[in-house]
Amino acid sequence: MSTTAYPDTILIIDFGSQVTQLIARRVREANVYCEIVPFQSADEAFKRLQPKGVILSGSPHSTTDIGSPRAPQAIFDAGIPVLGICYGEQTMCAQLGGNVESGHDREFGRAFLDVQEDSPLFAGIWAKGTRHQVWMSHGDRVTSLPDGFTIIGTSPNAPYAVIADEKRKYYGVQFHPEVVHTPDGAKLLQNFVHRIVGVKPGWTMGAYREQAVEAIRKQVGSGKVICALSGGVDSSVAALLAHEAVGDQLTCILVDHGLMRKDEAQQVVEMFREHYNLPLILVDASDRFIGALESESDPEKKRKTIGRLFIEVFEEEARKLGGADFLVQGTLYPDVIESVSFTGGPSVTIKSHHNVGGLPERMKMQLVEPLRELFKDEVRLLGKELGLPDSFIGRHPFPGPGLAIRCPGGVTREKLEILREADAIYLDEIRKAGLYDAIWQAFAVLLPVQTVGVMGDGRTYEFVCALRAVTSVDGMTADFYHYDMNFLGNAATRIINEVRGINRVVYDVTSKPPGTIEWE
């Protein structure tokens, strides 16, 4: 993902696990820079990044299958520490001369691990002879070890639950330390990167700010730059970074695509012109966007249409400015991860993000993406570093495609106005209840379903509004927010009474996974 090798990088090779992103989060929390790469491009990434250590992820594959993914031999030839997690442990063993078999007792869920030997991996956390909760998810298991390895931890169904070659600094764990269900897992990963790899905790937002500003200057040179400003945290932080880097070479452009929240465009313009002194152009392109989306119900096509129109508008505005060479976007690391297929097939791509996979292949400007390596919570920390107020940094995430993906089916002005009003009421109720900061993201969805209702003495046949609220740390996984039912009742009553076009309100209790946070 990065074009520059950081001096202290951990490379995470993804074999297709659903929780690989959590490994990266735990490593970043230890103030160490890391990158996730799919196994197919691991050789290239290893040469480019020159990592100090490598972590091998879990996988739905079996090492006993012909053609199953393997780690590059180069990592074992490099003499650097390696940690294999679940499948990562198994493929490391298989590649180094051990044996892995299928068909043994499987372990899924909570298990208890017995520590057989002390190790730098356990230092300050677990001691020999103690037992600890871990989270297992495996069908295969190691049955014999490569030369140099010893068993340092066991569980009832995994006699090789933790293995180590202390001399070469190779470690394997059959459980998943990256998930919260392994209570000491984050500390184990910290031990690996700090004690075993020897990387110091130098990954901070202050350091990132300096590196990002320098990288922007190097990429842009004396070229003209425009920034795709939406008013959200991501694009705002990207704009401030770019402005710090290139000053008057930057012009910010806010496209009002008609898909923003209530009064949002005007609020954004006032804030940036008055408080940040950034050159800002407001473009009303609502007719163009809504017209293109009215007959489009496929969510992927909606995202790609929005991405295409964004670029068209920006290119037109750039021409009015006398030409621009670069376009700044607030693309985040989860956007990039979710837009990459890690097994080479389209079925693995969760959704195209309008500012990654949704962009047209032919662009007349080069992309500048200074936040491409950051998770959402890191962007907020960077925003604080740049001086943005807490009230702004703490705003809930809002997707680039806006209300278009909260309005399943074709998009019309009428539907958008109904949704905008319902969403504003819902967020107002959340703020009045003092819940806004406890929730990662909350919003209303206008369903393409109408139901019968009764208002006064008359029959109604109007839309259904779904309310969504989730808790999360980084947007990669999320749980629905557990409201008090009185709150939901009050919010539903206000929406039905105050918004014409809605006669029924429901609440979404789906977590991520299996669902995504947004409906489309």
Curated annotation (Swiss-Prot):
Q: Which cysteines are joined by disulfide bonds?
A: none
Which PROSITE patterns does this one have? GATASE_TYPE_1 (PS51273), GMPS_ATP_PPASE (PS51553)
InterPro entries xrefs: Class_I_gatase-like, GATASE, GMP_synth_C, GMP_synth_GATase, GMP_synthase, GMPS_ATP_PPase_dom, NAD/GMP_synthase, Rossmann-like_a/b/a_fold
In its UniProt record, a GO molecular function of this protein is: GMP synthase activity
Keyword Acetylation assigned to the entry: answer is no
Family annotation (Pfam families): GATase, GMP_synt_C, NAD_synthase
Q: Where does ATP bind?
A: S230, G231, G232, V233, D234, S235, S236
Q: Does the keyword Protein transport apply?
A: no
Pathway assigned to this chain's UniProt record: Purine metabolism; GMP biosynthesis; GMP from XMP (L-Gln route): step 1/1
Q: Where is the Glutamine amidotransferase type-1 domain?
A: 9-202
Q: Which residues form the active site?
A: C86, H176, E178
The record's catalysed reaction(s) read: XMP + L-glutamine + ATP + H2O = GMP + L-glutamate + AMP + diphosphate + 2 H(+)
Give GO cellular component annotations, separated by semicolons. cytosol
Q: Which residues form the GMPS ATP-PPase domain?
A: 203-395
Q: What is its EC number?
A: 6.3.5.2
The record's keywords, sorted A to Z, are: ATP-binding, Glutamine amidotransferase, GMP biosynthesis, Ligase, Nucleotide-binding, Purine biosynthesis
Q: What does this protein do?
A: Catalyzes the synthesis of GMP from XMP.
Q: Which HAMAP family match?
A: GMP_synthase (MF_00344)
Q: What interactions and quaternary structure are annotated?
A: Homodimer.
Q: What protein name applies here?
A: GMP synthase [glutamine-hydrolyzing]
